Design a protein with these regions (language model features):
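Short glycine/serine-rich loop segments
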Residues: 1-84
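Flexible, glycine/charged-enriched surface loops at secondary-structure junctions
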Residues: 90-91
Length: 91
């Protein structure tokens, strides 16, 4: 429906996950870029706490942004968090 938007800077990614084009996507959120698209497209959006998922080397992130994911199920979100999370002394 071209009259609607998937919202946020991760809107294209959330549209792809919602349409079944990809099983999940990673994203960053500093002002709703995970949460808004998840709400608009019926996905599970995780905006992890700062430091939960390392951000070292991700130079495009704003200082207040954190990494997270968009998936279709809570189980997929938990699996992805297990893969992505962990301490990084460079953060």
């Amino acid at each position: 429906d071209p009259s609607r938007t998937p919202g946020g800077s991760s809107g294209g990614s959330s549209a792809a996950v919602s349409a079944g084009m990809v099983p999940f996507c990673t994203a960053s959120d500093g002002g709703g870029s995970i949460r808004t698209p998840a709400a608009f497209t019926g996905l599970v959006g995780l905006r992890a706490s700062y430091g939960r998922i390392p951000t070292f080397g991700d130079t495009h992130l704003a200082q207040n942004a954190v990494v997270g994911s968009l998936t279709t199920t809570v189980a997929d979100t938990a699996l992805l968090l297990d893969v992505m999370a962990g301490p990084d002394p460079r953060d």
